[in-house]
A protein has these predicted regions:
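Short, ordered, surface-exposed loop/turn motifs in non-cytosolic proteins
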Residues: 28-30, 38-56, 80
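Hydrophobic beta-strand segments
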Residues: 46-51, 85, 124, 164, ...
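A short, solvent-exposed loop/turn motif at the edges and junctions
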Residues: 55-57, 61, 84-98
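Exposed, low-structure sequence patches enriched in small/polar residues
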Residues: 406-940
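Conserved "repeat-terminator" motif of extracellular CCP/Sushi domains
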Residues: 22-25, 108-126
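Structured extracytoplasmic
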Residues: 117, 121, 128-299, 305-313, ...
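A short, amphipathic beta-strand motif
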Residues: 28-36, 72, 110
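Short, acidic Ser/Thr/Gly-rich low-complexity loop/linker segments typical of extracellular
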Residues: 54-73
Length: 940
């Protein structure tokens, strides 16, 4: 009996083995990487599929296919016996690879050859493009039109509300790190070798990681969105950089984008979306490639390329569910290398959607890849961002207080990492993140620790931080936050002006390391020409604790300032300090030399909310003393009666005034929704901040009292109201317009020192919001409207000019204008202006009454003052040169008369022995009507 059972068991085992052998047929597999055969760059999103033979259609694509990932890696296998493998991508020749049945190959490097009849030919030969591609009757165009028409139909945004959890990780790595480690210099960095990742095409070293966990809230009616970051962590080289604008610039580069919008905001530019409802089918050419399976869904692979590859668009693939919904399951997009885009050699996005239980489609995962370079596009920094969505909830009501703040994003003030702020253990992060870190990513802290033990590396970090923050730390450490007091701004140590000559300045500012709520900054300065010492001392108390400076995070503080220094009325100091060395480089035109010595005692309160609404209240006492060519002379008109004719007239008399005191209160309301700007140590918006898209609305009112009673005057009570609007307007891939409008009014009678004088620029550098050919204090007004507009073509015009497009220049045009007037009450040349200060005049005139030299100031006339400029940017990637021309007020009357002179320089007299008076005029010479200005701007 036992032998029978054993026999039966053997039969069953043999039969099972036969069945298993039949159920596990021979598997053919291959994995590797796809690269550009010319450059060696990896190729993401290449279509890869097995071919199969049919009886009636011959060799066709099989149902088994995949795409290379964002790094060009791929893996594919089949058990159906397919051995021919096809590699296909727009712009490259199709590659065919043959395997043996059952073969399993790994580490294969597939080189694809650029197709001269592919993407490049679409741009170069429009005749062929027109012949080969037609929109009318094209199934691909009809397909994309259906997708665009239904793109919002099954989107999660059609739900009444939702909540989702997000995990975001960004890594930075040094790419193509091929060096000779035996050389003397590189031997110092021999420890880096163990951190080199060789799994990619080129060896790379991960140097920085940032990750955060957050929640996203959405409500359809009324429309409200909110992102709340609950935890964040940064470690690596980035944690050593002291410029807050660096982190914000990175956030702006890798911001969330929506393909359903008409344009996509990437790399501080606007790219036309392949699903644009307005110009998609005219901007792109679409091709149906194949039908493949994507995560179990049969999808149509729709490839697309821009009509002009130098326009701001994408190449890529749309994977559209092959049913009546025309729903987008996945997309993979790349930026064409022909685009006039700097510092980026590769940029790709792969985005997946998933279907929720209620049938709506929601984001599932986004992977963004970028390679940045400075000098050599073969070496640079690799950046990768991965965002994963989980926990979609469309049912649970959202608490009302979630949307209590108007801002679309809440970020904790304190960083949640082991460096500063709340400590969260590495083990806790391991449990929180949905995907583990690789060994190379997890070892970043160890790498940085070894770097910071090197004096050479610490010196390099100190130099970079000094340039970007303009301050030198006083701690011998690579960590900027270790310093208690920093010295700077470094670009203000030495400067020059007409009054002081060479100006020497030394100062600094404290940090949160000294005290996290009390801050001090100040300086002392000395002029080699006027020999007067100047100073500034500012004490600030912040109501919230800060990590480094009082201008990180939301601003809420009160300040006390004592200052004695030189001021130049009408000088543009919006972006840089007046004594910045670059602002003191003069142009060839003569400067006016109008200066004041001013003592300030000032207190200020500032409060900023998450929604970027802020209020500022300031009280300032000042004592003003004229200097240089500037003088204060009170004009008093007295009535004169002719004893013969009994005619009356008003004759002016001038009373010199040495100084006056001023008491002024200021209230400012500012709203800039979506503004990510960071502020430097002086409280100015950082010049390194590249994202300028947010609008700004600012309403300011001044009320004050000018006290000159000690000079025999009556004093002046005044009110001034001013409104400013600033916004960047994008025109998709066709550039953008930067617009600033400012208007204001002075309500009471005030001397010229309190009138509005347009902001002027006397340096060789272009002032975006100032007048570049107007002289300092040339015009004065009490009612005014100013316009500053600059249009950046972003290369779309020059790209269409053969030959010139090879230079990769970008055109820029602009206009600056001011229109206003001076009412009678504030015109010292009229008797109604009695008691005012005379406009400063130190000019000399020729025999015909024309201005020759010196200084003069006058009310503006009936015409607006207009300047235009045109030029090119992207010269060596960061230089911009503009030709500037003065359009109006090139020959105009001054509001007074001057004696007519003979050839000997003596006044000419009439029959009564009185000087002959002629109308004074000012004619701007040719060199003063035209100018060339330079500016430095990263043309991204």
């Amino acid at each position: 009996m036992r032998q029978i059972k054993l026999y039966i068991s053997c039969i069953v085992l043999c039969f099972a083995g036969m069945v298993m052998a039949q159920e596990e047929p021979t598997r053919t597999s291959i994995s590797g990487i796809v690269v550009d055969g010319d450059t060696g760059e990896t190729l993401p999103f290449v279509q890869i599929y097995f071919l199969k033979s049919t009886s009636n259609k011959g060799v066709v694509a099989s149902e088994i296919g995949t795409t290379s990932d964002i790094d060009g890696n791929f893996s594919i296998s089949n058990t159906q016996g397919y051995t021919s493998l096809n590699f296909q991508m727009v712009g490259f020749k199709t590659e065919l690879l043959t395997l043996r049945k059952g073969q399993q190959r790994k580490g294969v490097r597939v080189k694809m050859t650029p197709d001269v009849y592919g993407l490049q030919d679409i741009v170069v030969t429009p005749k062929n493009r027109k012949r080969d591609y037609k929109r009318k009757g094209n199934p691909a165009v009809e397909l994309i039109q259906n997708v665009i028409a239904r793109k919002d139909s099954f989107c999660v945004h059609t739900a009444d509300q939702y909540t989702a959890q997000t995990y975001n990780r960004m890594s930075f790595a040094l790419d193509n790190l091929k060096v000779n480690w035996d050389k003397r210099f590189w031997k110092k960095f021999d420890f880096v070798r163990k951190y080199i990742d060789t799994t990619g095409v080129y060896p790379s070293v991960t140097i920085s990681i940032r990750e955060n966990i957050g929640e996203e809230y959405y409500q359809r009616k009324p429309h409200r969105e909110k992102k709340i970051m609950t935890k964040k962590r940064t470690f690596g080289i980035e944690d050593l950089i002291g410029s807050g604008s660096f982190q914000e610039n990175v956030n702006a580069i890798f911001r969330d984008v929506e393909i359903n919008d008409n344009s996509m905001n990437l790399l501080f530019n606007r790219f036309v979306s392949p699903l644009s409802s307005t110009i998609a089918t005219t901007f792109y050419q679409y091709y149906i490639m194949d039908t493949i399976m994507v995560d179990g869904y049969p999808c149509i692979d729709l490839a697309f390329v821009p009509v002009n590859s130098q326009s701001y668009g994408f190449t890529g693939h749309l994977y559209i569910v092959n049913d009546s919904t025309f729903r987008l399951k996945k997309y993979a997009i790349n930026i064409p290398p022909e685009i006039n885009l700097n510092f980026v050699s590769n940029f790709s996005i792969e985005h997946d959607y998933k279907q929720l239980d209620n049938g709506l489609w929601a984001p599932d995962r986004t992977t963004t890849y970028a390679k940045f370079y400075i000098f050599d596009n073969k070496r640079g920094i690799l950046a990768r961002q991965t965002k994963i969505y989980t926990g979609w909830d469309l049912e649970t009501p959202i608490a009302k207080e979630t949307f209590s703040s108007l801002t679309a994003e809440d970020i904790p003030t304190l960083a949640s990492d082991s460096t500063h702020g709340e400590y969260i253990s590495i083990q806790e992060w391991d449990n929180l993140r949905p995907e583990p870190l690789s060994w190379y990513e997890a070892s970043v802290q160890d790498l940085v620790h070894e770097f910071t033990s090197m004096p050479l590396f610490n010196s390099l970090v100190l130099f970079v931080n000094s340039v970007t923050t303009e301050y030198i730390t006083t701690e011998h450490s690579s960590h900027y936050w270790d310093s208690k007091f920093d010295i700077g701004p470094i670009f203000s140590f030495v400067s020059w002006n007409m009054l002081e000559g060479v100006r020497l300045r030394f100062g600094g500012a404290s940090t949160a390391k000294l005290h996290d709520q009390f801050y001090f900054r100040g300086y002392v300065a000395f002029g080699t020409k006027d020999l007067r010492p100047k100073y500034n001392a500012t004490l600030m108390y912040t109501f919230d604790k800060h990590e480094w400076t009082p201008y990180t995070g939301l601003r809420h503080h009160i300040t006390l300032t004592g200052q004695y220094d030189v001021e130049q009325p009408g000088l543009n100091t919006e972006m840089v300090e007046r004594d910045n060395i670059f602002a003191s480089i003069p142009t060839s035109k003569p400067t006016m030399g109008f200066y004041q010595y001013v003592f300030h005692a000032r207190t200020e309160y500032l409060k900023e909310w998450q929604n970027k609404l802020s209020i500022r209240a300031r009280f300032d006492f000042s004592n003003n003393e004229a200097a240089g060519a500037l003088s204060y002379n009170r004009v008093d008109y007295k009535m004169n009666v002719d004893p013969v004719t009994m005619d009356t007239s008003f004759l002016p008399s001038l009373t010199p005034i040495r100084s006056f005191r001023n008491y002024e209160g200021q209230f400012e309301l500012r709203y800039s929704p979506g503004n990510r700007a960071t502020f430097d140590r002086m409280g100015k918006e950082s010049t390194y901040m590249l994202d300028k898209d947010a609008p700004t609305f600012k309403l300011t009112h001044y009320v004050g009292y000018l006290d000159d009673r000690h000079n025999g005057g009556d004093g002046f009570v005044y009110n001034r109201t001013e409104f400013l609007f600033d916004k960047r307007f994008w025109f998709s891939a066709f550039g953008h317009l930067d617009l600033r409008l400012q208007t204001g009014m002075i309500w009471q009678k005030v001397p010229f020192t309190h009138l509005y004088m347009p902001s002027t620029n006397t340096s060789i550098f272009l002032a975006k919001h100032g007048f570049n050919l107007m002289h300092s204090m040339e015009f004065a007004m009490d009612e005014y409207v100013t316009l500053n507009a600059t249009y950046y073509f972003k290369g779309w015009l020059i790209n269409r000019i053969p030959g010139l497009n090879k230079l990769k220049l970008r055109g820029v045009v602009g206009v600056s204008a001011v229109y206003g007037g001076l009412t009678k009450k504030n015109n010292p040349f009229l008797e109604t202006g009695s008691g005012l200060y005379d406009f400063p005049q130190t000019a000399t005139f020729d025999n015909n009454g024309y201005y020759v030299a010196g200084s003069t100031s006058s009310p503006i006339g009936k015409l607006p003052y207009i300047e235009i400029n045109a030029g090119f940017e992207n010269i060596l990637k960061f230089i911009r040169i503009d030709y500037v021309r003065r359009i109006t007020y090139n020959d105009y009357e001054l509001p007074f008369k001057v004696p007519q002179m003979d050839n000997a320089g003596n006044p000419m007299l009439d029959e009564n022995g009185e000087p002959i008076m002629i109308q004074a005029r000012r004619r701007i010479p040719a060199w003063g009507r035209n100018g060339v200005k330079i500016s430095f701007r990263l043309a991204l």
